[in-house]
Regions:
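Structural alpha/beta surface segment adjacent to cysteine/selenocysteine redox centers
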Residues: 11, 18-103
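Extreme N-terminal starter segment of soluble prokaryotic enzymes
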Residues: 1-6
Length: 103
C-alpha cells in the first residue's frame, strides 16, 4: 500500500494554487496516494485566533503580495496577484469538492 500524501488546501488561496501546481510531480516521484483535504479558513481562523486577509494590517497584506510574487516567479507559475473578485465565497465549491471526494 503506498504512503498517503494529505494535501490540505483552501480552494481560493493563491498559496494552495502554487502548491497544487507542484503536487503532480511529487506524487509521481514518491508514488504516494494523494488525499485531498479541503479546509475552510474562516472556520479555522475562528478556532485559532487567526485574522482573515481583510482584517490584517495593510503592511501584512502588502508583504503577502510581495511573497506571492516571489514564489510565483521562483516556481515559474503565472499568477494574477490582485484579482477583482477575491476572496470569493467558496462554501458551495467546498461542498462540491467534499461530495466528489466522498463519491
Amino acid at each position: 500500500m503506498p504512503q498517503a500524501l494529505d494535501y490540505y488546501f483552501v480552494l481560493n488561496s493563491p498559496w494552495s494554487y502554487l502548491a497544487a501546481r507542484q503536487l503532480g510531480g511529487l506524487v509521481d516521484r514518491t508514488g504516494a496516494a494523494l488525499r485531498l483535504r479541503p479546509v475552510q479558513l474562516p472556520k479555522l481562523f475562528a478556532a485559532t485566533g487567526g485574522l482573515q486577509l481583510r482584517d490584517r494590517p495593510p503592511a501584512r497584506q502588502a508583504y503577502r503580495l510581495q511573497e506571492l510574487a516571489r514564489w510565483s516567479q521562483h516556481l515559474g507559475v503565472p499568477m494574477h496577484l490582485q484579482p477583482t473578485h477575491f476572496p470569493a465565497d467558496e462554501r458551495l465549491a467546498v461542498g462540491t469538492v467534499l461530495a466528489a471526494i466522498e463519491a
